[in-house]
Amino acid sequence: MASKSRHYLNQPWYIILFIFVLSLIAGTLLSSVYYVLAPIQQQAAEFDRNQQMLMAAQVISSDNTFQVYEKGDWHPALYNTKKQLLEISSTPPKVTVTTLSSYFQNFVRVLLTDTQGNLSSFEDHNLNLEEFLSQPTPVIHGLALYVVYAILHNDAASSKLSASQVAKNPTAIESIVLPIEGFGLWGPIYGFLALEKDGNTVLGTSWYQHGETPGLGANIANPQWQKNFRGKKVFLVSASGETDFAKTTLGLEVIKGSVSAALGDSPKAASSIDGISGATLTCNGVTESFSHSLAPYRALLTFFANSKPSGESHDH
């Protein structure tokens, strides 16, 4: 009797229906999981990207704690959420999503520049950051626009400035961070290069996305190797010791071998970095990435290089 009542189990239509229903349920479950996890993944990616940016600017150390520059040196710091300021601390806590987000909101301004070195804000052009980054470089009044991340001075007055105010009068800028992108051995590489207010001296660099070989090319993301960039100059110094910001080579070269052994104290050494053993092609890609990515910023970097220490209005 039971066998007769279940005769349909072997019917083709039942098997097809069963597979369809099972697939529908599985698809619904997977979609639900993706819907729930997508915002979390996006938040994690944003945290990592912003963390890497601030590591390049030395605001966050390789130990994932805040740092603050005072009295001519970097000191371990904590982010005081009440005062919303960095304060020197002998036992700084690890950076969290909350503290990084608060610091970013108060002391990082996302600006725009063009090939003439003019600074502006997204609000000035009625542009949205997310849409801007997902589309080809927009052109306003015949000039392409490029992103600049401005790190502001660690004081209450600077934290209250809008992006438009900073763009019009950049005296509150402590350092700038530029997005760097190019191709390594196995695919695209994305990172940041942070420069001091002089527009020439490197604070640091970081790479937040790459597909290079672990133990070889992947060492571009190793903090120990990245320390080699500190203090380097993006504008090549001439043999006479002078720098022609309008014409000289702009970029950083990762050479094969050691800079001290290959270049000694020659002017080129100031813009060169020790290579990574066994990763020559990746290093060549990094060199090309700096050259290509920095080119549109020459006028802006020249402006900062020629600015007086006291600062001046960016209206030219």
Curated annotation (Swiss-Prot):
GO molecular function, one term: FMN binding
Bilayer disposition of the protein: Single-pass membrane protein
One annotated GO biological process: sodium ion transport
Keywords: Cell inner membrane, Cell membrane, Flavoprotein, FMN, Ion transport, Membrane, NAD, Phosphoprotein, Sodium, Sodium transport, Translocase, Transmembrane, Transmembrane helix, Transport, Ubiquinone
InterPro entries referenced in this protein's UniProt entry, alphabetically: FMN-bd (IPR007329), NqrC (IPR010204)
Cofactor: FMN
SMART domains for the chain: FMN_bind
Subunit organization: Composed of six subunits; NqrA, NqrB, NqrC, NqrD, NqrE and NqrF.
Entries under NCBIfam families matching the protein: nqrC (TIGR01938), PRK05346.2-3 (NF003752)
Family from the record: Belongs to the NqrC family.
Protein name: Na(+)-translocating NADH-quinone reductase subunit C
Source organism phylogeny: Bacteria, Pseudomonadati, Chlamydiota, Chlamydiia, Chlamydiales
